Amino acid sequence: MKFRVLVITVLSIFLISCNNGSEDNTSFTEIDAPAEISERAYSFAQLYKQSDTEYHLGGQDPVRAIQIDCSGLIIMCYKYALVDTKYQLLVSDMTANYMYRNASTHITKSELKKGNLIFMGESDSSEVTYIALFEKLENGRIYFIDSTQKDTNGDGINDIDGVTYRNYSEDDSRFKAFGRMRVKY
């Protein structure tokens, strides 16, 4: 009998202290990241580049001497850019494809601004598998910062390994889409 009273008391306290579902704790406003946030994110990407950050699939290490992948770079740069603001990322860990499908507003090439998202993939596929931060479009070339690991010479040695500043022709088939990061507050 004492055990039954104890169980009922504990359950009652638990139920009273829990949210009964009438309050919506997921309510927030979602917007495109303001231009100044995107520019700050790009500035943090430059710092990663200057720090000789290495590439590592699945990497999202916030400490120096780090390894980071393409989506981790974007996430960390935006997280740093959002410090001391009222904004947050929609989700704290995302793949490039998830950002493309769920955490960005798609824009045209002519709408790109520094710090916007470049969604990329293999030349022979329409799938988004990769992401970079836009810097500028100049003389028919798109300049960006990304994190990658590539053997561009075909010799089995990765001559690109880490956060890089690169550019491709604006018509390169690896470009799949462009976007603005979505944030919430």
Regions found by a protein language model. Give the residues of each.
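Bacterial N-terminal signal peptides that target proteins for export
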Residues: M1-V7
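Short, structured beta-strand/loop micro-motifs enriched in basic residues and often containing a Trp
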Residues: D93-A103
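C-terminal motif of bacterial Sec signal peptides marking the signal peptidase cleavage site
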Residues: L15-S17
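Aromatic- and glycine-rich peptidoglycan recognition patches
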Residues: F28-I31, T105-I107, V128-Y185
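Short glycine/serine/proline-enriched coil/turn segments at secondary-structure junctions
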Residues: D124-S126
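Structural motif
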Residues: G115-L117
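N-terminal capping segments
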Residues: G21-L89
